[in-house]
Protein backbone atom coordinates (compact mmCIF):
# COMPACT_ATOMS: atom_id res chain seq x y z
CA UNK A 1 0.00 0.00 0.00
CA UNK A 2 1.36 3.35 -1.00
CA UNK A 3 1.65 6.09 1.66
CA UNK A 4 -0.10 9.40 0.80
CA UNK A 5 0.90 12.85 1.91
CA UNK A 6 -1.71 14.78 3.77
CA UNK A 7 -1.27 18.58 3.91
CA UNK A 8 -0.64 19.86 7.41
CA UNK A 9 0.78 16.55 8.65
CA UNK A 10 4.38 17.18 7.96
CA UNK A 11 6.58 15.64 5.30
CA UNK A 12 5.53 12.44 3.62
CA UNK A 13 7.29 9.32 4.59
CA UNK A 14 10.38 8.12 2.68
CA UNK A 15 9.61 6.65 -0.68
CA UNK A 16 6.31 8.36 -1.09
CA UNK A 17 5.48 10.57 -4.13
CA UNK A 18 4.35 14.27 -3.82
CA UNK A 19 1.52 15.61 -6.16
CA UNK A 20 2.82 17.74 -9.04
CA UNK A 21 0.30 20.56 -8.64
CA UNK A 22 1.01 21.09 -4.98
CA UNK A 23 4.60 22.16 -5.39
CA UNK A 24 5.46 24.86 -2.73
CA UNK A 25 6.28 28.44 -4.01
CA UNK A 26 9.84 29.49 -4.28
CA UNK A 27 11.44 30.37 -1.06
CA UNK A 28 11.40 34.29 -0.16
CA UNK A 29 8.65 35.42 -2.63
CA UNK A 30 6.09 36.66 -0.04
CA UNK A 31 8.68 38.44 2.03
CA UNK A 32 9.92 40.50 -0.95
CA UNK A 33 6.44 41.80 -1.91
CA UNK A 34 5.60 42.78 1.68
CA UNK A 35 8.75 44.82 2.05
CA UNK A 36 8.01 46.82 -1.14
CA UNK A 37 4.46 47.72 0.04
CA UNK A 38 5.63 48.89 3.43
CA UNK A 39 8.23 51.14 1.81
CA UNK A 40 5.70 52.98 -0.45
CA UNK A 41 3.28 53.55 2.45
CA UNK A 42 6.01 55.07 4.58
CA UNK A 43 6.98 57.45 1.80
CA UNK A 44 3.35 58.59 1.31
CA UNK A 45 2.93 59.21 5.02
CA UNK A 46 6.11 61.25 5.13
CA UNK A 47 4.93 63.37 2.19
CA UNK A 48 1.54 64.02 3.79
CA UNK A 49 3.19 64.94 7.05
CA UNK A 50 5.44 67.44 5.29
CA UNK A 51 2.46 69.09 3.57
CA UNK A 52 0.53 69.31 6.84
CA UNK A 53 3.52 70.84 8.58
CA UNK A 54 3.94 73.44 5.84
CA UNK A 55 0.26 74.40 6.07
CA UNK A 56 0.51 74.75 9.83
CA UNK A 57 3.52 77.00 9.45
CA UNK A 58 1.70 79.20 6.90
CA UNK A 59 -1.33 79.57 9.14
CA UNK A 60 0.84 80.46 12.08
CA UNK A 61 2.57 83.11 10.00
CA UNK A 62 -0.80 84.59 8.91
CA UNK A 63 -2.09 84.62 12.47
CA UNK A 64 1.03 86.33 13.73
CA UNK A 65 0.75 88.98 11.00
CA UNK A 66 -2.93 89.62 11.93
CA UNK A 67 -1.99 90.00 15.58
CA UNK A 68 0.72 92.47 14.64
CA UNK A 69 -1.76 94.52 12.59
CA UNK A 70 -4.24 94.54 15.47
CA UNK A 71 -1.56 95.72 17.83
CA UNK A 72 -0.54 98.48 15.43
CA UNK A 73 -4.19 99.60 15.06
CA UNK A 74 -4.66 99.70 18.83
CA UNK A 75 -1.48 101.69 19.19
CA UNK A 76 -2.70 104.20 16.60
CA UNK A 77 -6.03 104.57 18.40
CA UNK A 78 -4.27 105.12 21.68
CA UNK A 79 -2.08 107.76 20.07
CA UNK A 80 -5.12 109.54 18.62
CA UNK A 81 -6.88 109.49 21.97
CA UNK A 82 -3.80 110.89 23.61
CA UNK A 83 -3.61 113.65 21.00
CA UNK A 84 -7.29 114.52 21.51
CA UNK A 85 -6.83 114.63 25.25
CA UNK A 86 -3.84 116.89 24.80
CA UNK A 87 -5.83 119.19 22.51
CA UNK A 88 -8.70 119.35 24.98
CA UNK A 89 -6.30 120.15 27.77
CA UNK A 90 -4.74 122.88 25.66
CA UNK A 91 -8.17 124.35 24.87
CA UNK A 92 -9.15 124.30 28.51
CA UNK A 93 -5.91 126.00 29.41
CA UNK A 94 -6.50 128.64 26.74
CA UNK A 95 -10.05 129.25 27.98
CA UNK A 96 -8.84 129.55 31.53
CA UNK A 97 -6.15 131.97 30.45
CA UNK A 98 -8.70 133.99 28.45
CA UNK A 99 -11.07 134.14 31.41
CA UNK A 100 -8.27 135.18 33.69
CA UNK A 101 -7.27 137.86 31.21
CA UNK A 102 -10.83 139.18 31.03
CA UNK A 103 -11.12 139.18 34.79
CA UNK A 104 -7.88 141.09 35.05
CA UNK A 105 -9.18 143.66 32.56
CA UNK A 106 -12.54 143.97 34.29
CA UNK A 107 -11.12 144.42 37.75
CA UNK A 108 -9.62 147.86 37.05
CA UNK A 109 -12.82 148.96 35.31
CA UNK A 110 -14.96 147.74 38.19
CA UNK A 111 -12.65 149.44 40.63
CA UNK A 112 -12.83 152.68 38.66
CA UNK A 113 -16.63 152.47 38.43
CA UNK A 114 -16.86 151.68 42.11
CA UNK A 115 -14.67 154.67 42.84
CA UNK A 116 -16.92 156.90 40.67
CA UNK A 117 -20.17 155.65 42.22
CA UNK A 118 -21.47 157.71 45.11
CA UNK A 119 -21.62 156.25 48.54
CA UNK A 120 -25.41 156.02 48.43
CA UNK A 121 -25.48 154.09 45.12
CA UNK A 122 -27.95 151.16 45.05
CA UNK A 123 -27.86 148.33 42.48
CA UNK A 124 -31.10 148.15 40.46
CA UNK A 125 -32.58 145.03 38.85
CA UNK A 126 -35.25 145.76 36.18
CA UNK A 127 -38.69 144.39 37.10
CA UNK A 128 -41.18 145.13 34.27
CA UNK A 129 -43.89 143.21 36.12
CA UNK A 130 -43.91 145.91 38.78
CA UNK A 131 -44.67 148.65 36.24
CA UNK A 132 -48.18 149.84 35.57
CA UNK A 133 -50.14 148.55 32.59
CA UNK A 134 -49.98 151.99 30.99
CA UNK A 135 -46.18 152.00 31.18
CA UNK A 136 -45.95 148.50 29.73
CA UNK A 137 -48.32 149.42 26.90
CA UNK A 138 -46.24 152.46 26.07
CA UNK A 139 -43.11 150.31 26.02
CA UNK A 140 -44.79 147.83 23.66
CA UNK A 141 -45.95 150.67 21.44
CA UNK A 142 -42.50 152.24 21.31
CA UNK A 143 -40.88 148.92 20.42
CA UNK A 144 -43.46 148.31 17.69
CA UNK A 145 -43.07 151.82 16.28
CA UNK A 146 -39.29 151.54 16.08
CA UNK A 147 -39.45 148.08 14.52
CA UNK A 148 -42.06 149.14 11.95
CA UNK A 149 -40.15 152.30 11.10
CA UNK A 150 -36.85 150.61 10.31
CA UNK A 151 -38.47 147.70 8.52
CA UNK A 152 -40.30 150.20 6.35
CA UNK A 153 -37.10 152.05 5.52
CA UNK A 154 -35.35 148.86 4.45
CA UNK A 155 -38.35 147.64 2.45
CA UNK A 156 -38.75 150.97 0.62
CA UNK A 157 -35.04 151.04 -0.21
CA UNK A 158 -35.24 147.54 -1.69
CA UNK A 159 -38.34 148.41 -3.70
CA UNK A 160 -36.77 151.65 -4.96
CA UNK A 161 -33.69 149.78 -6.15
CA UNK A 162 -35.87 147.19 -7.89
CA UNK A 163 -37.89 149.91 -9.62
CA UNK A 164 -34.74 151.63 -10.83
CA UNK A 165 -33.33 148.37 -12.19
CA UNK A 166 -36.62 147.59 -13.94
CA UNK A 167 -36.73 151.06 -15.50
CA UNK A 168 -33.17 150.75 -16.79
CA UNK A 169 -33.83 147.27 -18.15
CA UNK A 170 -36.91 148.50 -20.02
CA UNK A 171 -34.86 151.03 -22.03
CA UNK A 172 -31.84 148.88 -22.80
CA UNK A 173 -33.20 148.17 -26.27
CA UNK A 174 -34.21 151.78 -26.88
CA UNK A 175 -33.59 152.91 -30.46
CA UNK A 176 -32.39 156.36 -29.47
CA UNK A 177 -30.62 158.00 -26.59
CA UNK A 178 -33.32 160.66 -26.48
CA UNK A 179 -36.07 158.12 -25.80
CA UNK A 180 -33.97 156.45 -23.13
CA UNK A 181 -33.38 159.75 -21.33
CA UNK A 182 -37.07 160.65 -21.58
CA UNK A 183 -38.18 157.37 -19.97
CA UNK A 184 -35.66 157.68 -17.13
CA UNK A 185 -36.61 161.32 -16.58
CA UNK A 186 -40.29 160.44 -16.26
CA UNK A 187 -39.41 157.67 -13.85
CA UNK A 188 -37.38 160.09 -11.76
CA UNK A 189 -40.30 162.53 -11.58
CA UNK A 190 -42.65 159.79 -10.41
CA UNK A 191 -40.15 158.63 -7.82
CA UNK A 192 -39.74 162.18 -6.56
CA UNK A 193 -43.50 162.69 -6.31
CA UNK A 194 -43.87 159.39 -4.48
CA UNK A 195 -41.14 160.24 -1.95
CA UNK A 196 -42.69 163.66 -1.39
CA UNK A 197 -46.06 162.05 -0.74
CA UNK A 198 -44.54 159.58 1.72
CA UNK A 199 -43.07 162.45 3.70
CA UNK A 200 -46.43 164.22 3.80
CA UNK A 201 -48.78 163.19 6.58
CA UNK A 202 -52.19 162.48 5.10
CA UNK A 203 -55.28 163.54 7.04
CA UNK A 204 -59.04 163.51 6.75
CA UNK A 205 -59.01 167.21 5.84
CA UNK A 206 -57.31 166.33 2.54
CA UNK A 207 -60.61 164.90 1.25
CA UNK A 208 -64.08 166.28 0.65
CA UNK A 209 -67.05 163.97 1.17
CA UNK A 210 -69.32 163.74 -1.87
CA UNK A 211 -71.76 161.17 -0.50
CA UNK A 212 -71.98 158.22 1.86
CA UNK A 213 -72.50 155.13 -0.30
CA UNK A 214 -72.40 152.32 2.25
CA UNK A 215 -72.47 151.31 5.87
CA UNK A 216 -71.10 148.33 7.69
CA UNK A 217 -70.95 146.86 11.15
CA UNK A 218 -67.96 148.98 12.23
CA UNK A 219 -67.81 151.91 9.83
CA UNK A 220 -68.98 153.42 6.59
CA UNK A 221 -67.87 153.97 3.00
CA UNK A 222 -67.83 157.46 1.51
CA UNK A 223 -67.33 158.78 -1.98
CA UNK A 224 -64.64 161.44 -1.55
CA UNK A 225 -62.64 163.83 -3.68
CA UNK A 226 -59.02 164.72 -2.98
CA UNK A 227 -58.61 168.44 -2.57
CA UNK A 228 -55.26 168.87 -4.31
CA UNK A 229 -55.92 166.95 -7.54
CA UNK A 230 -59.70 166.45 -7.67
CA UNK A 231 -59.47 162.67 -8.04
CA UNK A 232 -62.37 160.51 -6.85
CA UNK A 233 -61.89 157.69 -4.35
CA UNK A 234 -63.89 155.46 -2.04
CA UNK A 235 -62.95 156.06 1.59
CA UNK A 236 -63.65 153.35 4.15
CA UNK A 237 -63.61 154.62 7.74
CA UNK A 238 -63.46 152.43 10.85
CA UNK A 239 -63.81 153.69 14.40
CA UNK A 240 -60.89 152.58 16.57
CA UNK A 241 -63.03 152.54 19.69
CA UNK A 242 -65.38 150.00 18.11
CA UNK A 243 -62.42 147.93 16.94
CA UNK A 244 -61.15 147.80 20.52
CA UNK A 245 -64.50 146.94 22.06
CA UNK A 246 -65.23 144.16 19.56
CA UNK A 247 -61.61 142.97 19.48
CA UNK A 248 -61.42 143.36 15.72
CA UNK A 249 -57.67 144.06 15.62
CA UNK A 250 -56.86 140.92 13.64
CA UNK A 251 -59.59 141.63 11.07
CA UNK A 252 -58.32 145.17 10.54
CA UNK A 253 -54.76 143.91 10.09
CA UNK A 254 -55.80 141.14 7.69
CA UNK A 255 -57.86 143.45 5.47
CA UNK A 256 -55.07 145.97 5.20
CA UNK A 257 -52.51 143.24 4.40
CA UNK A 258 -54.66 141.70 1.65
CA UNK A 259 -55.21 145.03 -0.08
CA UNK A 260 -51.56 146.05 0.32
CA UNK A 261 -50.22 142.76 -1.07
CA UNK A 262 -52.67 142.51 -3.96
CA UNK A 263 -52.01 143.71 -7.47
CA UNK A 264 -54.80 141.75 -9.13
CA UNK A 265 -57.50 143.18 -11.43
CA UNK A 266 -60.01 141.02 -9.53
CA UNK A 267 -59.43 142.78 -6.19
CA UNK A 268 -60.34 146.37 -5.38
CA UNK A 269 -57.23 148.57 -5.51
CA UNK A 270 -55.88 150.24 -2.39
CA UNK A 271 -54.10 153.54 -3.02
CA UNK A 272 -53.12 154.43 0.53
CA UNK A 273 -54.20 154.07 4.14
CA UNK A 274 -53.72 156.26 7.19
CA UNK A 275 -55.09 156.88 10.67
CA UNK A 276 -55.71 159.51 13.29
CA UNK A 277 -56.58 159.35 16.96
CA UNK A 278 -60.14 158.15 16.29
CA UNK A 279 -60.37 156.44 12.90
CA UNK A 280 -58.66 154.13 10.45
CA UNK A 281 -58.93 155.10 6.78
CA UNK A 282 -58.63 153.05 3.59
CA UNK A 283 -58.50 155.04 0.33
CA UNK A 284 -59.56 152.71 -2.50
CA UNK A 285 -60.74 152.93 -6.08
CA UNK A 286 -64.38 153.81 -6.60
CA UNK A 287 -66.41 151.17 -8.46
CA UNK A 288 -69.56 152.96 -9.68
CA UNK A 289 -71.57 149.89 -10.73
CA UNK A 290 -72.72 149.04 -7.20
CA UNK A 291 -72.68 145.45 -5.97
CA UNK A 292 -74.13 142.12 -7.02
CA UNK A 293 -76.71 142.20 -4.23
CA UNK A 294 -78.31 145.32 -5.71
CA UNK A 295 -78.62 143.55 -9.06
CA UNK A 296 -80.17 140.46 -7.44
CA UNK A 297 -82.70 142.58 -5.57
CA UNK A 298 -83.58 144.36 -8.81
CA UNK A 299 -83.75 141.38 -11.21
CA UNK A 300 -84.63 138.52 -8.79
CA UNK A 301 -82.96 135.82 -10.91
CA UNK A 302 -80.36 135.59 -13.67
CA UNK A 303 -80.32 133.37 -16.71
CA UNK A 304 -77.75 130.58 -16.83
CA UNK A 305 -75.61 132.50 -19.32
CA UNK A 306 -75.47 135.60 -17.11
CA UNK A 307 -74.91 133.43 -14.04
CA UNK A 308 -72.09 131.63 -15.84
CA UNK A 309 -70.39 134.95 -16.58
CA UNK A 310 -70.50 136.30 -13.02
CA UNK A 311 -69.66 132.96 -11.36
CA UNK A 312 -66.70 132.47 -13.72
CA UNK A 313 -65.34 135.88 -12.79
CA UNK A 314 -65.89 135.07 -9.12
CA UNK A 315 -63.82 131.90 -9.58
CA UNK A 316 -60.92 133.98 -10.91
CA UNK A 317 -61.30 136.53 -8.11
CA UNK A 318 -61.28 133.86 -5.39
CA UNK A 319 -58.30 132.21 -7.06
CA UNK A 320 -56.42 135.52 -6.88
CA UNK A 321 -57.11 135.73 -3.13
CA UNK A 322 -55.91 132.17 -2.58
CA UNK A 323 -52.71 132.79 -4.54
CA UNK A 324 -51.88 135.54 -2.07
CA UNK A 325 -52.13 132.98 0.73
CA UNK A 326 -55.39 134.36 2.16
CA UNK A 327 -58.91 133.03 2.70
CA UNK A 328 -61.77 135.49 2.31
CA UNK A 329 -64.33 133.67 4.54
CA UNK A 330 -67.06 136.25 3.81
CA UNK A 331 -67.76 136.05 0.09
CA UNK A 332 -71.32 137.24 -0.56
CA UNK A 333 -73.12 139.42 -3.14
CA UNK A 334 -72.58 142.49 -0.93
CA UNK A 335 -68.80 142.16 -1.35
CA UNK A 336 -68.83 141.60 -5.12
CA UNK A 337 -68.53 145.08 -6.65
CA UNK A 338 -69.03 146.04 -10.29
CA UNK A 339 -66.70 148.46 -12.04
CA UNK A 340 -67.55 150.93 -14.80
CA UNK A 341 -67.12 148.24 -17.49
CA UNK A 342 -69.47 145.76 -15.77
CA UNK A 343 -66.81 143.36 -14.52
CA UNK A 344 -66.55 142.33 -10.87
CA UNK A 345 -63.99 142.90 -8.13
CA UNK A 346 -63.88 141.52 -4.60
CA UNK A 347 -63.90 143.84 -1.60
CA UNK A 348 -64.39 143.86 2.19
CA UNK A 349 -61.68 141.56 3.56
CA UNK A 350 -62.59 142.15 7.20
CA UNK A 351 -63.00 138.42 7.90
CA UNK A 352 -60.13 137.23 5.73
CA UNK A 353 -57.13 135.47 7.18
CA UNK A 354 -53.68 134.47 6.01
CA UNK A 355 -53.10 132.25 9.08
CA UNK A 356 -50.43 134.71 10.20
CA UNK A 357 -50.11 135.33 13.93
CA UNK A 358 -51.08 138.98 13.46
CA UNK A 359 -54.35 137.81 11.86
CA UNK A 360 -55.37 136.16 15.12
CA UNK A 361 -57.32 138.06 17.78
CA UNK A 362 -55.75 135.84 20.44
CA UNK A 363 -52.30 137.14 19.50
CA UNK A 364 -53.26 140.78 20.01
CA UNK A 365 -55.26 139.99 23.15
CA UNK A 366 -52.26 138.27 24.69
CA UNK A 367 -49.96 141.07 23.60
CA UNK A 368 -52.21 143.73 25.12
CA UNK A 369 -53.05 142.27 28.50
CA UNK A 370 -51.76 138.69 28.63
CA UNK A 371 -55.19 137.03 28.53
CA UNK A 372 -56.89 134.84 25.99
CA UNK A 373 -59.26 136.20 23.38
CA UNK A 374 -62.86 136.75 24.25
CA UNK A 375 -64.82 133.76 22.97
CA UNK A 376 -67.72 136.02 22.16
CA UNK A 377 -65.69 137.65 19.43
CA UNK A 378 -65.13 134.39 17.58
CA UNK A 379 -67.29 133.46 14.66
CA UNK A 380 -70.16 131.22 15.65
CA UNK A 381 -73.91 130.97 16.02
CA UNK A 382 -75.45 134.05 17.66
CA UNK A 383 -77.24 133.85 20.95
CA UNK A 384 -81.00 134.04 21.22
CA UNK A 385 -82.21 137.54 20.37
CA UNK A 386 -85.57 139.22 20.54
CA UNK A 387 -87.57 138.33 17.48
CA UNK A 388 -88.71 141.52 15.82
CA UNK A 389 -90.80 139.72 13.25
CA UNK A 390 -94.38 138.76 14.18
CA UNK A 391 -94.65 136.25 11.38
CA UNK A 392 -94.86 132.56 12.12
CA UNK A 393 -92.59 130.81 9.65
CA UNK A 394 -94.79 127.73 9.77
CA UNK A 395 -97.68 129.62 8.17
CA UNK A 396 -95.59 131.38 5.51
CA UNK A 397 -95.08 130.01 2.05
CA UNK A 398 -91.58 130.03 0.58
CA UNK A 399 -92.40 132.97 -1.70
CA UNK A 400 -93.73 135.00 1.23
CA UNK A 401 -90.63 134.20 3.26
CA UNK A 402 -88.40 135.33 0.40
CA UNK A 403 -90.37 138.57 0.06
CA UNK A 404 -89.88 139.29 3.76
CA UNK A 405 -86.23 138.30 3.55
CA UNK A 406 -85.57 140.66 0.63
CA UNK A 407 -87.11 143.62 2.48
CA UNK A 408 -84.73 143.07 5.38
CA UNK A 409 -81.75 142.03 3.29
CA UNK A 410 -80.05 145.40 3.08
CA UNK A 411 -80.76 146.24 6.73
CA UNK A 412 -79.15 142.95 7.73
CA UNK A 413 -76.02 143.95 5.86
CA UNK A 414 -75.76 147.09 7.99
CA UNK A 415 -76.11 145.26 11.32
CA UNK A 416 -73.30 143.97 13.52
CA UNK A 417 -74.65 140.43 13.22
CA UNK A 418 -74.54 140.40 9.43
CA UNK A 419 -75.86 137.59 7.31
CA UNK A 420 -74.58 134.02 7.61
CA UNK A 421 -76.32 132.79 4.42
CA UNK A 422 -73.07 132.20 2.52
CA UNK A 423 -70.68 130.98 5.24
CA UNK A 424 -69.48 127.36 5.17
CA UNK A 425 -70.63 125.02 7.99
CA UNK A 426 -67.11 124.05 9.07
CA UNK A 427 -66.48 127.67 10.11
CA UNK A 428 -69.50 127.66 12.44
CA UNK A 429 -68.57 124.44 14.22
CA UNK A 430 -64.95 125.60 14.70
CA UNK A 431 -63.50 122.70 12.75
CA UNK A 432 -60.29 122.95 10.79
CA UNK A 433 -60.90 124.58 7.43
CA UNK A 434 -58.96 125.88 4.49
CA UNK A 435 -59.47 127.64 1.20
CA UNK A 436 -62.33 125.30 0.31
CA UNK A 437 -64.68 127.29 2.57
CA UNK A 438 -64.73 130.06 -0.07
CA UNK A 439 -66.00 127.59 -2.69
CA UNK A 440 -69.03 126.84 -0.49
CA UNK A 441 -69.86 130.56 -0.57
CA UNK A 442 -69.58 130.52 -4.35
CA UNK A 443 -72.09 127.66 -4.53
CA UNK A 444 -74.55 129.59 -2.33
CA UNK A 445 -74.26 132.68 -4.56
CA UNK A 446 -74.79 130.58 -7.69
CA UNK A 447 -77.91 129.05 -6.12
CA UNK A 448 -79.29 132.54 -5.41
CA UNK A 449 -78.54 133.77 -8.94
CA UNK A 450 -80.50 130.89 -10.52
CA UNK A 451 -83.26 130.33 -7.94
CA UNK A 452 -83.83 133.80 -6.53
CA UNK A 453 -82.86 133.36 -2.87
CA UNK A 454 -80.00 131.82 -0.88
CA UNK A 455 -80.28 128.08 -0.25
CA UNK A 456 -80.57 128.42 3.55
CA UNK A 457 -82.27 131.79 4.04
CA UNK A 458 -84.50 132.31 7.07
CA UNK A 459 -86.11 135.19 8.91
CA UNK A 460 -83.60 135.02 11.75
CA UNK A 461 -79.84 134.44 11.55
CA UNK A 462 -79.99 131.66 14.13
CA UNK A 463 -82.39 129.68 11.94
CA UNK A 464 -79.98 130.14 9.05
CA UNK A 465 -77.11 128.78 11.15
CA UNK A 466 -79.19 125.73 11.99
CA UNK A 467 -80.02 125.10 8.33
CA UNK A 468 -76.42 125.45 7.18
CA UNK A 469 -75.09 123.07 9.81
CA UNK A 470 -77.78 120.54 8.81
CA UNK A 471 -77.37 121.16 5.09
CA UNK A 472 -77.88 117.50 4.18
CA UNK A 473 -81.54 117.76 5.22
CA UNK A 474 -82.23 121.42 4.40
CA UNK A 475 -80.65 121.84 0.94
CA UNK A 476 -83.57 121.61 -1.50
CA UNK A 477 -84.11 122.73 -5.08
CA UNK A 478 -87.61 124.15 -5.79
CA UNK A 479 -89.73 122.16 -8.21
CA UNK A 480 -90.96 125.23 -10.09
CA UNK A 481 -87.42 126.36 -11.03
CA UNK A 482 -85.81 124.57 -13.96
CA UNK A 483 -82.06 124.09 -13.72
CA UNK A 484 -79.82 122.36 -16.21
CA UNK A 485 -78.14 119.15 -15.01
CA UNK A 486 -74.72 120.86 -15.23
CA UNK A 487 -75.72 123.82 -13.05
CA UNK A 488 -77.41 121.67 -10.39
CA UNK A 489 -74.44 119.30 -10.32
CA UNK A 490 -72.00 122.17 -9.80
CA UNK A 491 -74.09 123.61 -6.95
CA UNK A 492 -74.32 120.23 -5.24
CA UNK A 493 -70.59 119.64 -5.57
CA UNK A 494 -69.90 123.03 -3.98
CA UNK A 495 -72.55 122.85 -1.23
CA UNK A 496 -71.24 119.63 0.28
CA UNK A 497 -68.89 118.45 3.01
CA UNK A 498 -65.45 120.03 2.98
CA UNK A 499 -63.64 116.75 2.26
CA UNK A 500 -65.77 116.13 -0.85
CA UNK A 501 -66.09 119.74 -2.02
CA UNK A 502 -65.01 120.62 -5.52
CA UNK A 503 -61.85 122.70 -5.42
CA UNK A 504 -60.45 121.19 -2.22
CA UNK A 505 -57.68 119.26 -3.99
CA UNK A 506 -57.10 121.01 -7.30
CA UNK A 507 -58.24 124.49 -6.34
CA UNK A 508 -59.82 126.71 -8.97
CA UNK A 509 -58.70 124.45 -11.83
CA UNK A 510 -61.10 121.74 -10.66
CA UNK A 511 -64.00 124.17 -10.84
CA UNK A 512 -62.91 125.62 -14.18
CA UNK A 513 -62.99 122.15 -15.74
CA UNK A 514 -66.63 121.52 -14.71
CA UNK A 515 -69.03 121.10 -17.68
CA UNK A 516 -71.07 124.13 -16.55
CA UNK A 517 -68.20 126.37 -17.69
CA UNK A 518 -67.77 124.71 -21.08
CA UNK A 519 -66.80 127.37 -23.62
CA UNK A 520 -65.55 129.97 -21.10
CA UNK A 521 -62.34 131.70 -22.19
CA UNK A 522 -60.64 132.04 -18.82
CA UNK A 523 -57.60 133.92 -20.10
CA UNK A 524 -59.51 136.83 -21.68
CA UNK A 525 -62.92 136.88 -19.98
CA UNK A 526 -62.28 140.38 -18.68
CA UNK A 527 -61.92 141.63 -22.26
CA UNK A 528 -65.44 140.54 -23.22
CA UNK A 529 -68.50 142.76 -22.88
CA UNK A 530 -70.28 142.24 -19.57
CA UNK A 531 -74.03 141.43 -19.49
CA UNK A 532 -74.62 144.63 -17.55
CA UNK A 533 -72.66 147.86 -18.05
CA UNK A 534 -73.57 150.77 -15.75
CA UNK A 535 -74.72 153.94 -17.45
CA UNK A 536 -73.01 156.79 -15.66
CA UNK A 537 -73.76 160.48 -15.95
CA UNK A 538 -70.57 161.63 -14.21
CA UNK A 539 -67.55 160.37 -12.29
CA UNK A 540 -69.48 160.88 -9.06
CA UNK A 541 -72.63 159.07 -10.18
CA UNK A 542 -73.90 156.94 -7.27
CA UNK A 543 -77.24 155.91 -8.75
CA UNK A 544 -76.32 152.22 -8.42
CA UNK A 545 -75.88 152.52 -4.66
CA UNK A 546 -78.86 152.57 -2.22
CA UNK A 547 -77.91 155.96 -0.82
CA UNK A 548 -81.54 156.84 -0.02
CA UNK A 549 -81.64 154.09 2.60
CA UNK A 550 -78.70 155.55 4.51
CA UNK A 551 -80.37 158.78 5.61
CA UNK A 552 -78.64 162.09 6.29
CA UNK A 553 -75.01 161.89 7.31
CA UNK A 554 -72.44 164.50 8.23
CA UNK A 555 -69.72 165.60 5.88
CA UNK A 556 -67.07 164.17 8.18
CA UNK A 557 -67.10 161.02 10.31
CA UNK A 558 -68.52 161.48 13.77
CA UNK A 559 -66.01 162.63 16.35
CA UNK A 560 -65.99 161.03 19.78
CA UNK A 561 -63.65 160.93 22.72
CA UNK A 562 -61.19 158.09 23.09
CA UNK A 563 -59.53 158.07 26.45
CA UNK A 564 -57.32 154.99 26.11
CA UNK A 565 -54.68 155.84 23.51
CA UNK A 566 -52.45 152.98 24.65
CA UNK A 567 -54.65 150.53 22.75
CA UNK A 568 -53.15 151.70 19.45
CA UNK A 569 -50.67 148.81 19.49
CA UNK A 570 -52.52 146.71 16.85
CA UNK A 571 -52.80 149.76 14.56
CA UNK A 572 -49.09 150.57 14.42
CA UNK A 573 -47.84 150.32 10.84
CA UNK A 574 -51.32 150.70 9.38
CA UNK A 575 -50.23 153.60 7.14
CA UNK A 576 -49.54 152.46 3.60
CA UNK A 577 -48.79 153.81 0.13
CA UNK A 578 -47.27 151.80 -2.67
CA UNK A 579 -45.49 153.11 -5.74
CA UNK A 580 -47.20 150.72 -8.17
CA UNK A 581 -50.72 151.76 -7.22
CA UNK A 582 -49.75 155.42 -7.10
CA UNK A 583 -48.38 155.55 -10.66
CA UNK A 584 -49.56 152.71 -12.84
CA UNK A 585 -53.18 153.45 -11.93
CA UNK A 586 -52.52 157.15 -12.53
CA UNK A 587 -53.10 158.26 -8.97
CA UNK A 588 -50.29 160.83 -9.26
From Swiss-Prot:
It holds the Pfam family Pkinase. Keywords: ATP-binding, Kinase, Nucleotide-binding, Phosphoprotein, Serine/threonine-protein kinase, Transferase. Its EC number is 2.7.11.1. It is an enzyme of class 2 (transferase). The active site is at residue 330. Residues 29-42 have a biased composition (Polar residues). Residues 518-586 form the AGC-kinase C-terminal domain. ATP binds at residues 213-221, 236. PROSITE patterns: AGC_KINASE_CTER (PS51285), PROTEIN_KINASE_ATP (PS00107), PROTEIN_KINASE_DOM (PS50011), PROTEIN_KINASE_ST (PS00108). Residues 43-76, 100-117 have a biased composition (Low complexity). One of its GO terms (cellular component) is mating projection tip. It catalyses: L-seryl-[protein] + ATP = O-phospho-L-seryl-[protein] + ADP + H(+); L-threonyl-[protein] + ATP = O-phospho-L-threonyl-[protein] + ADP + H(+). GO terms for molecular function: ATP binding; identical protein binding; protein serine kinase activity; protein serine/threonine kinase activity. SUPFAM superfamilies: Protein kinase-like (PK-like) (SSF56112). Residues 1-76, 100-139, 370-389 are annotated as: Disordered. Gene3D superfamilies: Phosphorylase Kinase, domain 1, Transferase(Phosphotransferase) domain 1. Residues 207-517 form the Protein kinase domain. GO terms for biological process: budding cell apical bud growth; cellular response to salt stress; cortical actin cytoskeleton organization; establishment or maintenance of actin cytoskeleton polarity; intracellular signal transduction; maintenance of protein location in cell cortex of cell tip; positive regulation of establishment or maintenance of bipolar cell polarity regulating cell shape; positive regulation of exocytosis. SMART domains: S_TK_X, S_TKc. Belongs to the protein kinase superfamily. STE Ser/Thr protein kinase family. COT1 subfamily. Protein kinase that seems to play a role in the regulation of cell morphogenesis and proliferation. This is Serine/threonine-protein kinase CBK1. It comes from Yarrowia lipolytica (strain CLIB 122 / E 150) (Yeast). The gene is CBK1.
Amino acid sequence: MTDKWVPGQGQPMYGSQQPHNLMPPPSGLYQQNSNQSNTSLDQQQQFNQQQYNSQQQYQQQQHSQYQQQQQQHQQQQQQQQQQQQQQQQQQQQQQQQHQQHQQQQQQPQQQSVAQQQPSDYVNFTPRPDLLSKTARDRAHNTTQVISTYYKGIVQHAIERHQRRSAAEASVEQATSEERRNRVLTNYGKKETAYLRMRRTRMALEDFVTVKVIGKGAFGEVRLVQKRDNGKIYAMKTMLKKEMDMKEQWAHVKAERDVLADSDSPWIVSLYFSFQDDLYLYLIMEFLPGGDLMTMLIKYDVFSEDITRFYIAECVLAIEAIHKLGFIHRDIKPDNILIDKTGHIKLSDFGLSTGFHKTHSSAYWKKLKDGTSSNPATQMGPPQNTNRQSTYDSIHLTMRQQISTWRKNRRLMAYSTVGTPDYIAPEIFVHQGYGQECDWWSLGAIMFECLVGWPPFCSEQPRETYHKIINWRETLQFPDDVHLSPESEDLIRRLLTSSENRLGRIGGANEIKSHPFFRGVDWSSIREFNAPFVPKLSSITDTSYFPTDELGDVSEYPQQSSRSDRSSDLPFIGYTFSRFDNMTRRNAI
